[in-house]
Amino acid sequence: METTTKKARSLYIPYAGPVLLEFPLLNKGSAFSVEERRNFNLSGLLPEVVESIEEQAERAWLQYQGFKTEIDKHIYLRNIQDTNETLFYRLVQNHLEEMMPVIYTPTVGAACERFSEIYRRARGVFISYPNRHNMDDILQNVPNHNIKVIVVTDGERILGLGDQGIGGMGIPIGKLSLYTACGGISPAYTLPVVLDVGTNNQQLLNDPLYMGWRHPRITDDEYYAFVDEFIQAVKQRWPDILLQFEDFAQKNAMPLLTRYRDEICSFNDDIQGTAAVTVGTLIAASRAAGSQLSEQKIVFLGAGSAGCGIAEQIIAQTQREGLSEDAARQNVFMVDRFGLLTDRMPNLLPFQAKLVQKCDNLQHWDTENDVLSLLDVVRNVKPDILIGVSGQTGLFTEEIIREMHKHCPRPIVMPLSNPTSRVEATPQDIIAWTEGNALVATGSPFSPVIWKDKVYPIAQCNNAYIFPGIGLGVIASGASRITDEMLMSASETLAKHSPLVNNGEGLVLPALKDIQVVSRAIAFAVGKMAQQQGVAVKTSAEALQQAIDDNFWKPEYRDYRRTSI
């Protein structure tokens, strides 16, 4: 039976002439038809030939290849995004594996550091502390009325690079690009926001080109009151918004998530998204080895909000697999710069205190050190899994990895710190130190490792496997909150798409070319769980799938019809 593709309805727009060509969401450039050029006062403003989007994308790809540095490629792609968003997403989808590291990590780190230097065109919303009383007016200035996803940062903890001030805007822009490229969320529904509360980065304060508020960061009650003003203004403007907190400092990330997750549909990708993709990866890796996550002993290097968020989700998963909470917590060991977290360690943050080991249980350990180092922990715990979220390069030393491998034939090693310059150990070293036996997943992209004439592809434990699907699922289901169970369903769905589990070989995570398939599956699982949890209206499975299909945007030009304002 012959099938036909349903053609998108024509779009009625009031803009014309140069104004239309300057509107990134609507601009088609050389792809405007002869009729559209006549109807929208574009005749003579474009070259004669009417091109298809694929012809435009081919030209853009050739131009892209002419740039030699990753930051220049990033700037070029951002320029396309700011002039023709449909073409930008067609180009990125055509070359996702090549371009994802350019539009997001690791290249976005350099773009954040150089934000004021390479700034070209406004995108998103900048809300500075001196303008805090104009919050409602600022949000009313956003031209897109149907915003459904906001990614917001205050720029204080950008990747592993620290305080970048308003340069942190590069992260919400990049994240939302992946919501669209991987999760099919229309760019018209997205809004990047930076809360400009000053910066403690003296280099930025002294930089004559820095475009942010030149003031030390506000803190404590003033800071939280400012964030609350923002949240209330967002709720007033877009009551059904999905708000993603991004790259907030450890001291603020968890308090903000705790305070607002039941007030507005929100989540913190550094804490919950990282946890979801990591747990999904570990579920798949355990199944591929014929075991369960509950059977593994896990050591973390880095006990900040991200590391503790991953640990808590691992504990929740192993409880689902049958462990008691106490037994699940005894399998997880958190190490930070002061050593292993124990019940005798002072000044722990509340989210760290739940993850301590009891000193009474460590009396038999083979060590004479008062501070239990990562090597001490690895030597005594004999872990199956080692996870790095320290933001410090080189801390997974050869001695530590070899000690782990001595007791674990197939260790799982996950140096997750971003960007690449902050990774705890390179895949090349880990593979060599374990004689080719480690399963390695990283936070940043790495090329395959060649060791003793064998090729080892390296899985990237990228949050982009998770958050676009969560966003699509929330939009399609109309979920009012994001629950822990919705995040667990995302992890489980990701694990089900593992080539290593399904085929017995290949990467532990799906190929990037399949990421839209994975995102749609996660969207369905998240939407279904939202309905079961009572945070979304119950519908049939068919209706939920139809809602996902209806909300899945594709980078294709639509026919335009002229209308008045």
UniProtKB/Swiss-Prot annotation:
The record marks 270 as: Important for activity. Transmembrane segments: none annotated. The active site is at 104 (proton donor), 175 (proton acceptor). InterPro entries: Aminoacid_DH-like_N_sf, Malic_enzyme_CS, Malic_N_dom, Malic_N_dom_sf, Malic_NAD-bd, Malic_OxRdtase, NAD(P)-bd_dom_sf, NAD_malic_enz_proteobac. It comes from Salmonella typhimurium (strain LT2 / SGSC1412 / ATCC 700720). Divalent metal cations. Prefers magnesium or manganese. GO terms for biological process: malate metabolic process; pyruvate metabolic process. Its cofactor is Mg(2+); Mn(2+). Homotetramer. NAD(+) binds at residues 157, 270, 418. This is NAD-dependent malic enzyme. The gene is maeA. It catalyses: (S)-malate + NAD(+) = pyruvate + CO2 + NADH; oxaloacetate + H(+) = pyruvate + CO2. GO terms for molecular function: malate dehydrogenase (decarboxylating) (NAD+) activity; malic enzyme activity; metal ion binding; NAD binding; oxaloacetate decarboxylase activity.
